[in-house]
C-alpha cells in the first residue's frame, strides 16, 4: 500500500514497485483515505509519506496501529531527521527511510519486512 498526497509521486512509486514484482494493493492520497482502505486492502507493508494535508503520516500510522498493532509501516519521507525518527518510533513506525535513499533501498526493505512477516527471515 502506498500513501502519498502528491499524485505523481504516489503513482510513480506504486508503478515502480509493481514493475519490480510487488503487489500494491491500495493507493491513498491522504491519511484518512489510508485509514479507510487499510482493512479491506490488508497490505503486508504500508509505505507512508510524512507530510500530508489533514492528518500527517505519523498520526495516520498511530491510528492504523491502534486497529492493526502488527501492521508494518515504512515512513518514506524527504524530511527525515532524528526528531522525526524518534516520533515515528513512538507511534509504531517499523522503519524510517529518506526518499534520498532511493527506490532500490525501499524495495530491499519491503522485501525484508515481507519475509519477516512470513516467518522466513
Predicted features along the sequence, with ranges:
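Receiver (REC) domain active-site loop signature in two-component systems and cognate sites
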Residues: 52
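Conserved sequence signature across two-component system core domains
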Residues: 3-4, 28, 46
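Active-site beta3 strand of CheY-like receiver
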Residues: 41-47
Amino acid at each position: 500500500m502506498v500513501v502519498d498526497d502528491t499524485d505523481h509521486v504516489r503513482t510513480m512509486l506504486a508503478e515502480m514497485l509493481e514493475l519490480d514484482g510487488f503487489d500494491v494493493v491500495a493507493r491513498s492520497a491522504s491519511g484518512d483515505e489510508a485509514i479507510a482502505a487499510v482493512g479491506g486492502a490488508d497490505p503486508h507493508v504500508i509505505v507512508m509519506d510524512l507530510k500530508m494535508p489533514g492528518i500527517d503520516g505519523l498520526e495516520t500510522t498511530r491510528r492504523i496501529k491502534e486497529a492493526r498493532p502488527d501492521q508494518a509501516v515504512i515512513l518514506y519521507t524527504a524530511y527525515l531527521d532524528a526528531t522525526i525518527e524518534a516520533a515515528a518510533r513512538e507511534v509504531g513506525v517499523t522503519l524510517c527511510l529518506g526518499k534520498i535513499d532511493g527506490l532500490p533501498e525501499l524495495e530491499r526493505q519491503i522485501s525484508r519486512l515481507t519475509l519477516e512477516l512470513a516467518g522466513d527471515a
